[in-house]
């Protein structure tokens, strides 16, 4: 579990007097770290009792071609670039903004697989 509340330490190292304790709403979760593999999703309870779908592994992506306006489900071959972290390329992690190689060519991921549960991408010309 991650606690994402405000720190009780000042920049100088002194302490703020805590006005209250920790709250359940301030707890975070570990990142999904979606990678290429047989489809696997996880349901997570979120604020208000809603459900968020996390993609843990994915095989296919919905790739849109902006010039023709056609969207197709294609197989993901590998991750070629990832500006978020160079190590994600080696580990084949899928994040928003990553450039993947598909059957149609290179595509940039536009969705957040760990938040949305799907992988939407657009072809890079």
From Swiss-Prot:
Annotated coiled-coil segments of the chain: none
The keyword Electron transport is assigned to this record: no
Gene Ontology MF: a single term: structural constituent of ribosome
One GO CC term on file: ribosome
Position of the signal peptide: none
Example GO BP: translation
PROSITE patterns for this protein: RIBOSOMAL_S8E
Keyword list, A-Z: Ribonucleoprotein, Ribosomal protein
Superkingdom of this protein's organism: Archaea
InterPro entries linked: Ribosomal_eS8, Ribosomal_eS8_CS, Ribosomal_protein_eS8_arc, Ribosomal_Se8/biogenesis_NSA2
NCBIfam families assigned: eS8
Assigned protein family: Belongs to the eukaryotic ribosomal protein eS8 family.
Subunit organization: Part of the 30S ribosomal subunit.
Protein name: Small ribosomal subunit protein eS8
Species this chain originates from: Methanosphaerula palustris (strain ATCC BAA-1556 / DSM 19958 / E1-9c)
């Amino acid at each position: 579990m991650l606690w994402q509340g405000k720190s009780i330490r000042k920049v100088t190292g002194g302490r703020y007097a805590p006005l209250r304790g920790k709250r359940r709403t301030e707890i975070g979760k570990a990142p999904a770290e979606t990678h290429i593999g047989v489809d696997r999703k996880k349901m997570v309870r979120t604020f208000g009792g809603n459900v968020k779908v996390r993609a843990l592994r994915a095989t296919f992506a919905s790739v849109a071609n902006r010039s023709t306006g056609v969207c197709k489900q294609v197989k993901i071959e590998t991750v070629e670039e990832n500006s978020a972290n160079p190590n994600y390329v080696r580990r084949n992690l899928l994040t928003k903004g990553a450039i993947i190689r598909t059957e149609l060519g290179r595509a940039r991921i536009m969705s957040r697989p760990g938040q949305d549960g799907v992988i939407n991408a657009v072809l890079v010309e």
